[in-house]
Structure formats: C-alpha cells, structure tokens
From Swiss-Prot:
Enzyme class: lyase
EC numbers for this chain: 4.2.1.20
Protein known as: Tryptophan synthase alpha chain
One Pfam short name: Trp_syntA
Keyword Amino-acid biosynthesis belongs to the record: yes
Source organism per UniProt: Nitrobacter winogradskyi (strain ATCC 25391 / DSM 10237 / CIP 104748 / NCIMB 11846 / Nb-255)
Source taxon at top rank: Bacteria
Length: 278
C-alpha cells in the first residue's frame, strides 16, 4: 500500500530536493487557531506536517514543546479533538502527509483498535510514538502497519550498528534521526556529524532519513537538507507561536502569520539546499 508519505518522497526525489517537515502541537494555543496554522503550513512550503498529541508527561520534549502541550490541554484539546482537527484539515488538503507524534499512554487509553480506525478515517498517514521501543511492536506498530499507517521510528546518536536493525525492522515511511542527545530545542544540530550519521543509517535501509532536533534557522535547515532526505523543525515554530501570544497566552491577530512566515523562511532554506548541491 502506497501512503501519502511514500508519494511525497517519490515526488521530492523527482524534484531532487529534501523534505521540509514541520511540527506543532495540536490545539496550541487553542483548537481554532491551531487548525488555521496547520492549514497555512502547506502554503508556506511544508511538505509533511507532524502534529503533536498533547500529553501530561512528555518526557522527550523541551520547555517550549511542553508549554505548547500545556496550552493545548488547558484549551480543552484531546486526542479525539486532534483527530477531528485533522479531519477538518483534510477537507481542504488531501495530499499533504500528516504524522501524529507523541506518547503511547493517550493511545492506550483511547483504545488501540479504535484509535487506528479513527486516525485512518481522519486522514492520518503515519505515527511516531517516542516511548514504544521495537520490543513492543505488537502493541501498536504491527497493528498500525496492518491498518495502512506508516510507523516511523527514531534513531539517535547512541543507536549503534548492532541496535539499528531492530529499530528499522518494522519502520516505514521514513526514519527520524534525532541529531542530538537530549530533549527537543536543547542544542543546535551539527550538519557535518549529521551527514555521517545519515550515511550510516542508509547502509541499513532504503527508507528516507529525515533529521530533527536543533534546527532553528533557514541556514541550519539548508545545511541539514543538503545531508539528509528531510529537515524537521518543531521548537523554533513553537517558539514563534508562543512569542506571538498576548500576556494571557491567547492567540493574537498575528499568531497564524508569525508561524507561517517562519515556516516559509525555513522552507526556502530547505529548497535552497538542492540549488547549492547542483
């Protein structure tokens, strides 16, 4: 089964460029504004959209993404609401891949079978569940694959050649390489080291390898895009959203444009990587 993710990477290969992948938290700062931002991302140049599932204990997230999750939860966002929002997005956009990213607990409480049915119906294309290792593939990974969803694994600088085959065994869509050891937004990515790491991963898989964590500027995005199949930006976009809010943490008239403007600049950085490599 070919997913939107597979189709998008095939298109990008023909164009000779890497993907620009965005991350934002569902429902941040409120459901209506969140939907408006997500609708604006493809127009700004996003090739793939990752949407965070708000959770009360996000252990891999840095302060910015944790704050985004708190804002979303305070605004009443739920997993049901997240899926409903994606369904609304799909009314306007049937081609941009959407990946849900988060933790297993909300999915478990929702019910795995019901979650997969509802996610597929809403238009979700893939899942990244950061706290489910390959040893737990029977919990969600295998059922997701059977439901036609890509299950995207994380590889890190500490994932050695002995561990990689297990990480990659049931991975589909793309591999998400975490360029730094730590929480989101905590450091800058080293594009030279990333290039070596991506090359090592590609010796084990034919899947695209996208790189995230530590990409905050168009120049950084270009450097990563020159050395990988995609640059993932989350914390910088979340910071732009946060900076646009009023004193009470509510959306302003400039919130959507603040995020879209940064996304457009980052997208241009990614697209310039192809030009630099030619």
């Amino acid at each position: 089964m070919t997913t939107r993710i597979d189709t998008r990477f095939a298109e990008l290969r023909k164009q000779g460029r890497s993907a620009f992948v965005t991350f934002l938290m569902a429902g941040d700062p409120d459901p209506a504004t969140s939907l408006a931002i997500i609708k604006a991302l493809p127009r700004a140049g996003a090739d793939i959209i990752e949407i965070g599932m708000p959770f009360t204990d996000p252990m891999a997230d840095g302060p910015a993404v944790q704050a985004a999750g708190r804002r979303a939860l305070d605004a009443g966002m739920t997993l049901t609401g997240t899926l409903r929002m994606i369904g609304e997005f799909r009314k306007d956009d049937d081609s941009t891949p959407v990946v849900l990213m988060g933790y297993y607990n909300p999915v478990y409480i929702y019910g795995v079978e019901k979650f997969l049915d509802d996610a597929r119906a809403a238009g979700v294309d893939g899942l990244i569940v950061v706290d489910l290792p390959p040893e737990e593939d029977s919990e969600l990974c295998i059922p997701a694959m059977k439901a036609g969803l890509n299950f995207i694994r994380l590889a890190t600088p500490t994932t050695d050649d002995k561990r990689l085959p297990a990480v990659l065994a049931n991975t589909s869509g793309f591999v998400y390489y975490v360029s730094i050891t730590g929480i989101t937004g905590s450091a800058a990515a080293d594009s030279t080291a990333v290039g070596a790491a991506v090359g090592r991963i590609k010796r084990h898989t034919s899947l695209p390898v996208c790189v995230g964590f530590g990409i905050r500027t168009p120049d950084a995005a270009r450097g990563i895009a020159e050395r990988s199949d995609g640059a993932v930006v989350g914390s910088a976009l979340v910071d732009a959203l946060s900076a646009s809010l009023d004193a009470e943490g509510k959306a302003t008239s400039g919130t959507v444009q603040a995020v879209a403007s940064l996304a457009a600049a980052l997208a241009e950085g990614v697209r310039s990587a192809r030009q630099a490599a030619e």
